[in-house]
Curated annotation (Swiss-Prot):
Membrane topology: Multi-pass membrane protein
Keyword presence, Signal: no
Main localization of the protein described in the UniProt heading: membrane
Origin species: Escherichia coli (strain K12)
Annotated transmembrane regions: 7-27, 44-64, 90-110, 114-134, 136-156, 199-219, 226-246, 262-282, 287-307
Alphabetic keyword roster: Cell inner membrane, Cell membrane, Membrane, Transmembrane, Transmembrane helix
Induction record: By extreme alkaline conditions.
Family stated for the protein in its record: Belongs to the TerC family.
Protein name: Putative membrane-bound redox modulator Alx
Function recorded in the entry: Has been proposed to be a redox modulator.
Domain of life from the UniProt record: Bacteria
GO annotation, cellular component aspect: plasma membrane
Periplasmic side: 1-6, 65-89, 135, 220-225, 283-286
PANTHER family for the chain: MEMBRANE BOUND PREDICTED REDOX MODULATOR (PTHR30238), THYLAKOID MEMBRANE PROTEIN TERC, CHLOROPLASTIC (PTHR30238:SF0)
């Protein structure tokens, strides 16, 4: 697997992530179970975005010093494009978490605890998936066509799908987990497991955590191939992906109260997936430059938010009238 990642770059990335996770876990441990306020969520979202951009700037500077601008510029642009793709697609994941927490009546104070461990699990699972994907592409380059066709199909499916929380309990996976886990009927504070009559029982909070992890894996199956459309370098794919999901918890609490205001977002994300799928399918006939891909993704997001704002304005006006 060809990569610009040197031991220094890999080590620096690992140190930054470890320090930030340690700070996050330390704050979680000191404060105990509590809901993140909108102000805190906005502050942490800004911290994660700023840290991601600073890392990309340091990455670019390092490559300028070691490889030159001809290498540094496209690689830094690839990181930024991958980060934007993952960040935008992650919003749909946040909406699924909202449905899960609502269906299982998880108190806001406990949602943060679930998401702390959910993000930690996502880091491990996505790292495995990215290195596996990089290896497969290095061995079988035709697999990019499969990724492209899958993203094209997923984009169309996303635009046509209708999801609501009412059917979550009837999903085969949820029924299977409930049937095979020794589980209590109610949430017991912040515990994932409790002991009753000498036996260990999982609580519904553990079921929610499992579903959060599985939902992230499902979304990663979409988002990781999407970044492979930009670059197959495992260092850039992994770092851009993980920096994007590290801010997911703060994004969740930032959007939790206004999710219904983003009714058009799934259509914008669907268009992005279709564009990336087409980009992968035509790669042997025409290579779309990274800068163009970044511009298209950014443009789609801007247009989506403009249309969404107009739709909200019309709805608010109708309700007010």
């Amino acid at each position: 697997m060809n990569t610009v990642g040197t031991p220094l770059l890999w080590g620096g990335f690992a140190v930054v992530v470890a320090i930030m996770l340690a700070i996050d876990l330390l704050l979680q441990g000191r404060r105990g179970a509590h809901a993140m306020t909108m102000k805190q969520a906005a502050a942490w979202s800004l911290v994660w975005v700023t840290l991601s951009l600073l890392f990309n700037a340091a990455f670019w500077w390092y490559l300028v010093q070691t490889e030159g601008r001809a290498v540094a510029d496209p690689q830094a642009l690839a990181f930024l494009t991958g980060y934007l793709i993952e960040k935008s697609l992650a919003v749909d994941n946040v909406f699924v978490w909202l449905m899960l927490f609502s269906y299982f009546s998880v108190p806001a104070a406990l949602q943060r605890r679930v998401l702390v461990y959910g993000v930690l699990g996502a880091i491990v699972l996505r790292t495995i998936m990215i290195f596996t994907g990089s290896w497969l592409i290095s061995q079988f380059d035709w697999i990019l066509y499969i990724f492209g066709a899958f993203l094209l199909f997923t984009g169309v499916k996303m635009a046509l799908a209708h999801e609501d929380e009412s059917g979550i309990g009837d999903k085969p996976l949820v029924r299977w987990l409930r049937g095979h886990l020794r589980m209590t009927d109610t949430i017991d504070n912040e515990h994932f497991f409790v002991r009753k009559n000498g036996l260990l029982y999982a609580t519904p909070l553990m079921l929610v955590l499992i579903l959060v992890e599985l939902s992230d894996v499902i979304f990663a199956v979409d988002s990781i191939p999407a970044i492979f459309a930009v670059t197959t370098d495992p260092f850039i794919v992994l770092t851009s992906n993980l920096f994007a999901i590290l801010g997911l918890r703060a994004m969740y609490f930032l959007l939790a109260g206004v999710a219904e205001r983003f009714s058009m977002l799934k259509y914008g994300l669907a268009v992005i997936l279709v564009f990336i799928g087409i980009k992968m399918l035509i790669v042997d006939f025409y290579h779309i430059p990274i800068a163009v891909s970044l511009g298209v993704v950014f443009g789609i997001l801007v247009m989506t938010f403009i249309i969404n704002a107009w739709v909200n304005y019309r709805h608010d006006k109708q309700r007010g009238g």
